[in-house]
From Swiss-Prot:
It comes from Trifolium subterraneum. The gene is CHS4. Its EC number is 2.3.1.74. It catalyses: (E)-4-coumaroyl-CoA + 3 malonyl-CoA + 3 H(+) = 2',4,4',6'-tetrahydroxychalcone + 3 CO2 + 4 CoA. Signal peptide: none annotated. InterPro entries: Chalcone/stilbene_synt_C, Chalcone/stilbene_synt_N, Chalcone/stilbene_synthase_AS, Polyketide_synthase_type-III, Thiolase-like. This is Chalcone synthase 4.
Amino acid sequence: MVSVSEIRKAQRAEGPATILAIGTANPANKVEQATYPDFYFKITNSEHKVELKEKFQRMCDKSMIKSRYMYLTEEILKENPSVCEYMAPSLDARQDMVVVEVPRLGKEAAVKAIKEWGQPKSKITHLIFCTTSGVDMPGADYQLTKLLGLRPYVKRYMMYQQGCFAGGTVLRLAKDLAENNKGARVLVVCSEVTAVTFRGPSDTHLDSLVGQALFGDGAAALIVGSDPVPEIEKPIFEMVWTAQTIAPDSEGAIDGHLREAGLTFHLLKDVPGIVSKNIDKALVEAFQPLGISDYNSIFWIAHPGGPAILD
């Protein structure tokens, strides 16, 4: 009789999870950062807030961003004036946009990743979809399955409200799925549309302005799998180790709340400080078991934020 351990071993991949393909997509509407403050304060009827606009201009100038892509055009915003106000009830209007646009943008990125992968989409065994832009049921994972024409029995995982660490979260999950399911090919999609967070400026909520200066719309897709098929699949990266941690004294540093006015967010000024105080400990936990002390000798990723966090 075959033992349980032998069955479990046969069900698992032999090698580490690898990223086999990458695809990205953005809305057609491109916004130049240098002129965005003029547009933003005009479309939100806030041009009388001269000092606040000057502050926002400085934020944009220091952002190290030259351009962004946004689903929200001038025409869309004029048709939905409640979205342009600071805290006007507008969730219905926002939801109507994102429940359609989020999976559509995700499809664009996924199609590119599948094409680069070079295998038929029928070989996709798992789907992970992650977004902070809107919540619906059935979710964006279901909508993407239909848009791509995936098999109905693809194993789906829908993740909402992960915020800035969405990318790291889906990579961690994809690695576990690929390594513990022999032959698994995981389609991973993150798609964000800032229609859910866009709002007019407020003198009392400057951290909202930081988001208006930094955030853009886009989607990214990966194919993740272990034991690449020789001469057909071409792995780009191997994922050796993933983890997640809660930094001490970080509660309230980054908050998001879904309200009638959309998704509101709050950022403390000390977020870069919290990251810098705790990054060394996280690196030691990651690399010490592997016998690595020179962090610059290998490729690793910490969650990237604005320039203050990266610095």
